[in-house]
Amino acid sequence: MFRKKEMKYRGINVWVACLCLLLAACDKEDNNDSNNFATGIVELPALRNGANDVFVTHYTTFNGQKVTSFSMEYDKSKKHSRWIAFRFDNQTKQQNVSRSDEPFDADPAIGSQYQRVQADFGKQGYDRGHLCASADRLYSREVNEQTFYYTNMSPQRNKFNTGIWLTLEGQVQSWGRSCTSSDTLYVVKGGTIDKEDQIRGYISNDLSKPIPKYYYMALLFKKGDSFKAIAFWMEHTDTPKSTKLVDYALSIDELEEKTGIDFFPNLNDNLENALEATYSTKAWPGLE
């Protein structure tokens, strides 16, 4: 829950048993018109709902079922997503295709005039960095192609995009693909675009095209009836402060204070408060 907790606990292994059926109401699917009311999908942060903000969920049909690809809150005035949210479960963790050869393209759900184009990246010295990585969505060709929408792109320095950020993405994919039929890893990713001291600069000095100074992830892992949570915060730089992912870990509460975003607000309040106040690096295999 997005408010300051009176106490913070670091390095404590917390697995919270949830005996209520809180997820039953939380997994309903919403459509792209839900920008004006709270959604119940577990992975989604609280919507900012600013005048220039648009909430979009992309779907695919997989094995005859409608499946959520990923969701985003997109700021049209900054031509950048505030966050991207998705999940790994027994279905979406599958690796049935390789990276798409499809070109980067405009997102059909948002007017192209509100999106960046190729010239905003390479010629400016930045990669077209996926927020929802291509390797995050490999269960079908259609979903992988959706990750190449420009609304899912963020200007990233190549050494960051192919370095420590890629390392974190790979670790998250490993956790996600460890899911069994009763497990789900909920993921939120983003770059900072709202606070001036968290903006690295602007493409061509255009204030509608900020470059994030920091990138983050918020993770919630449901394993059976137990939960754990952790977050990561990385400065967008060519030279990382560390090559160890553990050095970037923090609690969800701490990430909320940095970003001003309320993560996982659809959880039961007591569960949310307990999960977000602390984290244990030992609870996440491969982190230490």
PLM feature segments, named:
Residues 2-15:
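Bacterial N-terminal signal peptides that target proteins for export
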Residues 15-22:
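Bacterial N-terminal signal peptides
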Residues 2, 26-288:
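Domain-level detector for secreted/extracellular nuclease and nuclease-toxin modules, and
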